[in-house]
Amino acid sequence: MSQEIAVVGSPEFTTGFRLAGVRKFETVPDENKDEQLDEAVRSALGDDDVGIIVMHNDDLEHLSRTVREDVETSIEPTLVTLGGGAGAGGLRDQIKRAIGIDLMEEDES
């Protein structure tokens, strides 16, 4: 069974993904993030068709502690955050957390 990408965030953040063909998205206006972002993320987490959730790194600050812990420890779907200066190190940590090994580990021999 193939799984889909879901994007959660502001209209500005989700629009590009929608134009690229992502069909699952939860749009939350910036002014409503504190009230609505938790529910949008829970919806994506609970969707069996979703394998990856994409969010802007800065949006993690708007999540309640419980939802943030749920999404950060979720194996499937896996959270990928973009922006906010996370860089390659942030992606490396996300991959390591998701699959349990460091694919980018340098061989010390």
UniProtKB/Swiss-Prot annotation:
GO terms for cellular component: plasma membrane. GO terms for molecular function: ATP binding; proton-transporting ATP synthase activity, rotational mechanism; proton-transporting ATPase activity, rotational mechanism. It is found in: Cell membrane. It comes from the Archaea. InterPro entries: ATPase_V1-cplx_f_g_su, ATPase_V1-cplx_fsu_bac/arc, ATPase_V1_fsu_sf. Keywords: ATP synthesis, Cell membrane, Hydrogen ion transport, Ion transport, Membrane, Transport. SUPFAM superfamilies: AtpF-like (SSF159468). It holds the Pfam family ATP-synt_F. Component of the A-type ATP synthase that produces ATP from ADP in the presence of a proton gradient across the membrane. HAMAP family: ATP_synth_F_arch. Has multiple subunits with at least A(3), B(3), C, D, E, F, H, I and proteolipid K(x). Belongs to the V-ATPase F subunit family. This is A-type ATP synthase subunit F. It comes from Haloquadratum walsbyi (strain DSM 16790 / HBSQ001). The gene is atpF.
